[in-house]
């Protein structure tokens, strides 16, 4: 009974190692700000690494295509619900991450019976001052 927290911590550490090893093989996504917005470039020969989420929000994904698509659809649904319930100006990456995506990713990662998302995302937002903001989201819900 006393070793259960240790087992959980060991399982989390193993999951971190597993996901990092899988993501090493992926093709990167790079975001660059410029005067009139931002550019997101994907280096994968496969289509479908860069998406528009909402009017001024874009997503670049690295990882398993099914996980990228599932989280893209989640972000898309959240953004449209937020825009419908409040206003289009209230749809920001900060709100989408803090109240929707990050808690879901964290919960999924910490449930050791489930497979973790194999994903790392770059989100770009052109704010109302026309400057670009970038956020990196990890598989465990951590974002910066």
Language-model-detected regions and their locations in the chain:
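Long, low-complexity N-terminal extensions
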Residues: 1-144
């Amino acid at each position: 009974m006393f070793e259960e927290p240790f087992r959980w911590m060991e399982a989390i550490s193993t999951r971190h190692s597993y996901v990092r090893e899988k993501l090493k093989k992926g093709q990167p996504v790079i975001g660059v700000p410029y005067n009139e917005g931002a550019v997101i470039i994907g280096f994968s020969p496969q289509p479908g690494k860069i998406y528009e989420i909402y009017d001024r929000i874009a997503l670049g994904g690295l990882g398993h295509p099914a996980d990228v698509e599932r989280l893209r659809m989640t972000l898309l649904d959240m953004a449209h619900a937020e825009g419908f319930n409040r206003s289009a100006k209230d749809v920001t990456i900060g709100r989408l991450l803090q109240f929707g995506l990050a808690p879901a990713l964290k919960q999924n990662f910490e449930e050791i019976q489930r497979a973790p998302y194999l994903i790392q995302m770059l989100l770009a937002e052109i704010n109302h001052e026309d400057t670009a903001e970038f956020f990196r989201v990890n598989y465990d819900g951590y974002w910066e």
